[in-house]
């Protein structure tokens, strides 16, 4: 069946500030569940100037303990892989993220875009679409999808709030 979560936010800060803040966002005391983010690959396309990055995030397992009775869910950490393409010429950064930990049981995809806002070049537009489909947990599939939808919806709001806080701390009052 699967679930989907979507978000949109306009940050009243220039693209460069938002992208730099995003790439340096974690770890932060504002989000205790993200333990680390490690860049495992980075290269620049000499023809286009597009910077490609692959990063691995290590996060606490936040699945409730009553669901962790299922052996496949009994892990301390969850690993996410994020790939990003930063094009400073067009002022667009595209990201694709998926879960490595439960890849054989679930498909978790998140696609995000940061781009210069068409309304105001000093602003940055953020859009995100995420989907989760759980197939390998039998009767728990729907229960886990419902939990995932609630968790992801909350997580998107929290992530946006963290970005707003970091941008205010690093860049001061937003541009209008």
Curated annotation (Swiss-Prot):
Residues 1-175 form the PRELI/MSF1 domain. It comes from the Eukaryota. Coiled coil: none annotated. It holds the Pfam family PRELI. It comes from Xenopus tropicalis (Western clawed frog). GO terms for cellular component: mitochondrial intermembrane space. This is PRELI domain-containing protein 2. InterPro entries: PRELI/MSF1_dom (IPR006797), Slowmo/Ups (IPR037365).
């Amino acid at each position: 069946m699967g679930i989907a979560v979507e978000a949109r936010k306009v940050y009243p800060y220039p693209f460069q500030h938002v992208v730099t803040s995003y790439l340096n966002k974690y770890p932060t005391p504002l989000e205790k569940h993200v333990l680390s983010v490690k860049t495992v690959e980075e290269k620049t396309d000499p023809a286009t100037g597009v910077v490609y990055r692959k990063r691995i995030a290590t996060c606490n397992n936040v699945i409730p303990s009553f669901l962790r009775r299922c052996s496949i869910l009994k892990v301390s950490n969850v690993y996410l892989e994020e790939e990003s393409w930063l094009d400073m010429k067009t002022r667009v950064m595209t990201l694709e993220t998926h879960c490595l930990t439960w890849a054989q049981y679930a498909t978790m995809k998140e696609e995000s875009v940061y781009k210069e806002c068409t309304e105001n070049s000093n602003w940055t537009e953020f859009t995100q679409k995420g989907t989760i489909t759980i197939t390998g947990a039998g009767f728990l599939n729907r229960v886990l999808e419902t939990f995932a939808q609630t968790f992801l919806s909350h997580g998107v709001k929290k992530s946006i709030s963290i970005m707003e806080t970091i941008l205010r701390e690093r860049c001061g009052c937003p541009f209008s």
